[in-house]
Structure formats: C-alpha cells, structure tokens
Design a protein with these regions (language model features):
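Class I SAM-dependent methyltransferase SAM/SAH-binding core
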Residues: 1-14
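Active-site micro-motifs of SAM-dependent methyltransferase domains
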Residues: 14, 31, 59
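Glycine-rich phosphate-binding loop signature in dinucleotide/nucleotide-binding domains
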Residues: 17-20
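Conserved acidic residues
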Residues: 22, 50
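A conserved beta-strand element that flanks and buttresses the S-adenosyl-L-methionine
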Residues: 25
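A short, conserved alpha-helix within the catalytic core of class I
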Residues: 33-48, 54
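C-terminal alpha-helical "lid/dimerization" subdomain adjacent to the S-adenosyl-L-methionine
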Residues: 55-117
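Core SAM-dependent methyltransferase catalytic element
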Residues: 109-137
Length: 137
C-alpha cells in the first residue's frame, strides 16, 4: 500500500513536531540560511529523519557566484528571500556535513536541472544532490 506524501512548509516544520520521517528532502534552501550556519538545520533534520536528501548549488569562483546570485534574485525577488553572498564549494559542503555529524552516502554533482535559457545561464556544474544519513553514536 502506498503512503501519501505530505508537504510541510519549513516555517512550520519544527514547531511541536515529534514525528519521525523516513526521508526529508530539502531543495535549494540551505544556501539561503548561510553556508556557515546551515549545519544547524541539518542537525535538526537528522533528529527527525535517518535520511536527508539535499539539492543545492556549488559555486566555482567569482563569476559563477554572480550567476547564482542573479538567478536567485530573479527566482526569489517576489518572496523577500535572502540572497546569499556565498554558495557552497566542494570543500565548504564537506565541512558542513562534518559539522552536522552526518555521513554522506552519495553525492551527484553536475546534473541538468533546467531546460532552455536557464540551463544556458546556470548550467549543470552548479547543481548537486547529496544523500546524507544519520550516524548513530
């Protein structure tokens, strides 16, 4: 029997939430929290789920960062979302995982998320998906 998936908006997610989940998926969110403090969100998520799937962005230098900022601004302007000054690079992502006390099961780097013009502007090297797992103490 299939279970129905339930979407829970982030603002409400941690309020009085005592449930455990098989999987939590977080898409293009952590860089808005800030790469220096995003490990705190991952730690919270690891308390309610053994598996976390993260989709986010890698920057590859100054020009790459400006492209990411432009696309973020365009996509989030109407929602008053913080546009970060920095995005993850491979090293900062690994540090975030370590600070979160999670284990990376698999990472998929460089995949196409968008079609057409957005793929031309923000090509596949800017995207990654990481499967993180809660490590028992």
């Amino acid at each position: 029997k299939r279970k129905k998936l339930k979407y829970i908006q982030y603002n409400d997610f941690f309020k009085n939430n005592k449930k455990k989940y098989d999987l939590v998926i977080i898409v293009d969110v952590l860089h808005h929290v800030g790469i220096e403090s995003s490990y705190k969100i991952l730690k919270k998520l690891s308390k309610i789920s053994k598996n976390i799937i993260v989709k986010d962005h890698f920057e590859h230098g100054f020009f790459s960062r400006q492209l990411l900022r432009f696309v973020d601004f365009y996509a989030n302007y109407a929602y008053d979302v913080n546009i970060p000054k920095k995005y993850y690079d491979y090293s900062s992502w690994k540090k975030t995982i370590k600070k979160s006390r999670l284990k990376e099961v698999k990472i998929i780097e460089s995949f196409q998320q968008h079609d057409g013009l957005f793929n031309f502007i923000l090509n596949k090297k800017h995207h990654f998906v990481s499967h993180l797992k809660h490590v028992k103490k």
